[in-house]
Regions:
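Contiguous beta-strand/loop segments that form the cofactor/metal-binding neighborhood of enzyme cores
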Residues: 202-307, 312, 317, 323-363, ...
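N-terminal glycine-/serine-/threonine-rich beta1-alpha1-beta2 phosphate-ribose binding loop
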Residues: 1-112, 130, 134-138
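Rossmann-fold dehydrogenase core element
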Residues: 131-149, 169-173
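Short helix/strand-capping hinge loops at secondary-structure junctions
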Residues: 113, 119-121
């Protein structure tokens, strides 16, 4: 019998609420996940997570660090280290912190012999990615980077046709992802500063990765310019950015990103991809409108993004829907991405269970190489 793996999520913010915890709760239902722990800087987000899923996941719970009853003003920046140190070896750590903190949390997980699911981008420096890749492979630990756009059916279809030569060779493209304006009033204002990151790094990486995923072409050169602005707390950040990416065959991708899609818009963001390809005597085209997917809802109350009432609804990324079991189940390529990484970790541990350490390490490394070569899940 395949044993479930325990999961510790480090970070209790937006992505944990919107995707990670409900996905992991459902995987707990199906026997992939056992114990769930969540670490956060303070108690308020943990309290919100405790209260947010009773209808969808009746009877399911997690252990909060610190306790959700702790005084909200108390901060625990290093508590996650104690929690990771107490975990049984070779379970799963989900890294869902602000981008500049990914490196130290991933490294702490590896030092404690844990497999890792990390939200994108994994780290902000190439040298850090190389360091993580080496340490993880030396220990036979899997690192999966949660680039969920890879699991969008339209991306998988495009990849297959590109592999078959149906488009020709990618030469020129443009992409766009403008996130909602209300992000500026969120915790972003505390970490999304000019010295730390910008919209291209934060969300533009989705499309840089997606073009590589579809074509197999690796980026070799990147240049970025940005427009600065002030957050409500006075911190300065890049609110807008445009990046130009050169791929190994000379192809060019322009990527425009920002924190500025109108809160009153149907959005909830603006995102799209267009790729032109050269063939023999003709050209090919891949065009994805990733914002409008054919569904419009107008609510009686402001339950949409930023309190909006009229929304373009994305049924493909992540939604909680009725199913034959209790509560609701998550569906969509966001859930598929999380499930693929955690299922892979469970598969690795099942294959290595009961083997002597040297054989176990060799078996884990073999599966890690297999997943790398398949290149569906993003890895270092």
């Amino acid at each position: 019998m395949t044993r479930p793996i325990d999961v510790t999520i480090v970070g209790g913010g937006m992505i944990t609420f919107d995707l990670l915890l409900p996905s992991i709760y459902h995987l707990q239902r199906t026997g992939v996940i056992g114990r769930i722990d969540i670490c956060a800087l303070d108690s308020p987000p943990l309290k919100a997570l405790k209260e947010g899923f009773g209808q969808a996941f009746p009877g399911q719970d997690f252990t909060a660090h610190p306790s959700e009853t702790e005084e909200p003003q108390k901060k625990y920046p290093d508590l996650y280290k104690e929690v990771l140190a107490a975990m049984p070896k070779r379970q799963a750590v989900v890294v869902a912190m602000p981008d500049p903190l990914h490196y130290e949390v991933v490294m702490e997980a590896l030092r404690n012999d844990q497999h890792v699911l990390c939200v994108k981008p994994m780290v902000l420096q190439y040298a850090q990615a190389v360091e993580i890749e080496k340490l993880a492979y030396d220990k036979g630990l899997f690192i999966g980077i949660e680039y969920h756009k890879r699991f969008d059916r339209r991306a998988l279809i495009a990849r297959r046709h590109y592999e078959l030569g149906d488009f020709g060779e990618f030469v020129m493209g443009e992409a766009k992802m403008i996130e909602p304006y209300y992000y500026r009033a969120s915790n972003f204002q505390n970490w999304f500063t000019c010295d730390k990151t910008d919209p291209f790094v934060y969300v533009g990486c989705h499309y840089v990765d997606l073009v590589q995923f579809i074509t197999g072409l690796r980026p070799v050169q990147v240049s970025v310019v940005g427009v600065k602005g002030k957050f409500p707390n006075g911190n300065e950040g890049f609110m807008w950015a445009n990046g130009r990416v050169i791929y190994e065959n000379g192809a060019i991708l322009s990527v425009t990103d920002g924190l500025g899609y109108p809160d009153e818009g149907a959005g909830s963001n603006e995102q799209c991809l267009m790729m032109f390809c050269e063939g023999e005597g003709k050209t090919g085209l891949i065009a994805h409108d990733d914002q409008f997917r054919g569904v419009e809802h107008s609510y009686l109350r402001g339950i949409g993004c930023a309190g909006s009432t009229f929304n373009y609804v994305n049924p493909d990324f992540y939604r909680l829907v009725p199913w034959e079991g209790p509560g609701y189940q998550p569906v969509g390529y966001g859930f598929d991405s999380v499930a693929a990484i955690l299922n892979t970790i469970q598969r690795i541990e099942h294959a290595a269970a009961g083997l002597p350490e040297a054989e176990s390490l060799a078996r884990r490394r073999a599966i890690i190489k297999e997943v790398d070569e398949k290149a569906i899940i993003a890895t270092p």
